[in-house]
């Protein structure tokens, strides 16, 4: 999925319109995540009706107010609006955490052709490897709500990076707590071995008295 957008500029739907325009930024944002491509237009009444449902769906999966950890999910708006002004107006109806392609980028139309978008609204759900999980998840989102994400998660076989990071941190913390104890333990054992070796050498010297084959 990352390859699909390398070399492109993705814009955050926040007040500052921050851009993700480097390979590193794109990879960090998209890698190992399910991607929802929302093809829509503010000119479409159906899209306007669907937007609040989509916004609520995405917020409940990614906003810390609702969840302890944000889901490994990205929403990318692919505008099929008739003008940049119309796109800007419709973006106000979408989550602030979503991304979008700049209006002047013709890649919007290319993606529409690539995924055979003929009617709106359309939500194409992609696995991290760019394969299609759902060609149009609009009805799923409307009927199942956030439960459909669990189905996508299983189908995508995501690696839970948050869990892995926590696991590594816990192991590292445990190692740091026990390392000094182990070092003391091994130091004491080494001293005991050295003392025993010195005692054995002293015993050999005391009982030596010419016991060699040529003594």
Swiss-Prot record:
Residue ranges that the Swiss-Prot or TrEMBL entry lists as coiled coil: none
Main location: other
Domain of life, source organism: Eukaryota
UniProt keyword Cell cycle present: no
Renumbered residue ranges of the record's region Disordered: 190-215
Domain Thioredoxin: 1-164
Keyword Kinase in record: no
Compartment annotation: Cell projection, Cilium, Photoreceptor outer segment
GO biological process, one term: photoreceptor cell maintenance
Function: Plays an important role in retinal cone photoreceptor survival. May play a role in cone cell viability, slowing down cone degeneration, does not seem to play a role in degenerating rods.
The protein's name: Nucleoredoxin-like protein 1
Gene that produces this protein: nxnl1
């Amino acid at each position: 999925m990352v390859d699909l957008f390398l070399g492109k500029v993705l814009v955050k739907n926040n007040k500052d319109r921050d851009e993700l325009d480097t390979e590193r930024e794109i990879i960090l944002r998209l890698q190992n995540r399910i991607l929802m491509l929302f093809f829509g237009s503010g000119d479409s009444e159906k899209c306007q009706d669907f937007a609040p449902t989509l916004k609520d769906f995405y917020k409940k999966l990614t906003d810390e107010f609702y969840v302890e950890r944000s889901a490994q999910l990205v929403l990318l708006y692919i505008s099929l609006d008739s003008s940049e002004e119309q796109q800007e107006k419709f973006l106000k109806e979408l989550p602030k955490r979503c991304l979008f392609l700049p209006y002047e980028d013709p890649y919007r139309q290319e993606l529409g052709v690539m995924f055979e978008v003929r009617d709106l609204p359309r939500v194409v759900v992609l696995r991290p490897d760019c394969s299609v999980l759902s060609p149009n998840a609009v009805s799923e989102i409307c009927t199942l709500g956030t439960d459909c994400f669990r189905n996508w998660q299983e189908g995508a076989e995501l690696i839970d990076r948050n869990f892995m990071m926590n696991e590594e941190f816990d192991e590292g913390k445990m190692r740091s707590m026990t390392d000094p104890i182990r070092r003391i333990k091994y130091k004491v054992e080494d001293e005991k071995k050295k003392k025993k070796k010195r005692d054995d050498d002293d015993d050999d010297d005391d009982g030596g008295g010419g016991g060699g084959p040529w003594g």
